[in-house]
């Protein structure tokens, strides 16, 4: 079995919104990489022993006092280094070049760079050819400051009309800098540039692929767990489902899954989970029907943050009770993924505001004396999905839209009641069914229905009735950090509205949410 961690790239994060995208692109190429904060020590870098280092972008100005710098060891480690945007600027400044502050002449968005000098980074890459016969590349820029003087030993590789050093290289030391962002899809040849860096310049093998990751994970799980038993909270979501399948492959029936039906799931979801994992895949599952317990705990509570905390607390209580029945279990499995690990490391800086409490944070009881098994903690979400497919999980389940941990608890606005959840489940199922029928489901990033605790007058036949209102929500987004409302066709929205009002007794009005993020969040609570 090849060692999937033998060849690796270290990415240093200076705060760019694109940094995780760089890591995902390197992984897609087939090379393992990790994302660390910029202020790491020489000892940590030596311990990781990367084959190459990428200095990512960031929002700061290299010209400002106390702005971040790469550790000096980066340039003495004897491995190739690629600086992207801010990473190029700090590389230039730290190695003796100069950076000037942009005054009204930054480049933001599409640009075309002209390649002046051959470079291993741009080998056999071009989008067009200039009048003078030089390669042109379509790229994505996002910078105010720029390099005004490159360090000794470097050559200018590419430029634009306003940026004299759009790319630079010291081929002897294998140091490269690009002012644009090769990791975003708008840079058409960006993936090939990153391939040149990771595979050709750094000499990495492309061993990081789903089948190898599964093989490696199964071996590591067997070694970690031995003959012990493991319990897992199975929600039916992507992460816990893939953890269940990996553990089942590694340790078979030594895995016990606890599936807690909190009454806040989608239509028929509990039955689907039991059918797939219990009947089809043959996993040991304890099914806990806890609808009343969750609803009773939330009775009278309208505050979204409090509802989230109650849902989390009741889940922990139930899971704790069930785990004590599994007396032989020595390990607790969790679906922690790599962005959770990055977020936890990053949150230590204390710079981010709390927008919403994350339903996985807050944890299980301190007195739960179980070891932790986290087989997905190195993986991004797209990698988890690919592994799920390889393990035999259905595509529709792995690629369905995100569903919040508290479920309908945060899609029923205000107090949560069984009547509201039942109506919402039916309305949401119609919306999703119609999206699939119209071939629109995969064209939006997330779609769902929200229950509004207001009654609205409706006309049915000759009579009037006061019934509930639901809102349809559909958004388009790349990263869920920002989102546009989806411009669904009017006739489609009309069809969904008619079906909901005519087929569900208790709903008299359907509205469509046309708020973007920001200022609104994607979920209503």
UniProtKB/Swiss-Prot annotation:
Reactions catalysed, as given in the entry = XMP + L-glutamine + ATP + H2O = GMP + L-glutamate + AMP + diphosphate + 2 H(+)
Q: Which residues form the active site?
A: 85 (nucleophile), 181, 183
Q: Which GO terms describe its cellular component?
A: cytosol
Domain annotation GMPS ATP-PPase: ranges: 208-400
**Chain residues that bind ATP:** 235-241
Which UniProt keywords are present, listed alphabetically? ATP-binding, Glutamine amidotransferase, GMP biosynthesis, Ligase, Nucleotide-binding, Purine biosynthesis
Q: What is its EC number?
A: 6.3.5.2
Recorded hits in CDD domains, A to Z, give:
GATase1_GMP_Synthase, GMP_synthase_C
Query: Entry's PROSITE patterns?
Result: GATASE_TYPE_1, GMPS_ATP_PPASE
Q: Name one GO molecular function term.
A: ATP binding
Keyword ATP-binding assigned = yes
Tell me the ranges covered by the Glutamine amidotransferase type-1 domain, including all copies. 8-207
- In the UniProt record, the signal sequence range is none
Which pathway is it part of?
Answer: Purine metabolism; GMP biosynthesis; GMP from XMP (L-Gln route): step 1/1
**EC class of the enzyme, as a word:** ligase
Subunit and partners: Homodimer.
Q: Which NCBIfam families match?
A: guaA_Cterm, guaA_Nterm, PRK00074.1
Reported function = Catalyzes the synthesis of GMP from XMP.
Record-given protein name: GMP synthase [glutamine-hydrolyzing]
Species for this entry = Shewanella piezotolerans (strain WP3 / JCM 13877)
**What does the record give as the organism's lineage?**
Bacteria, Pseudomonadati, Pseudomonadota, Gammaproteobacteria, Alteromonadales
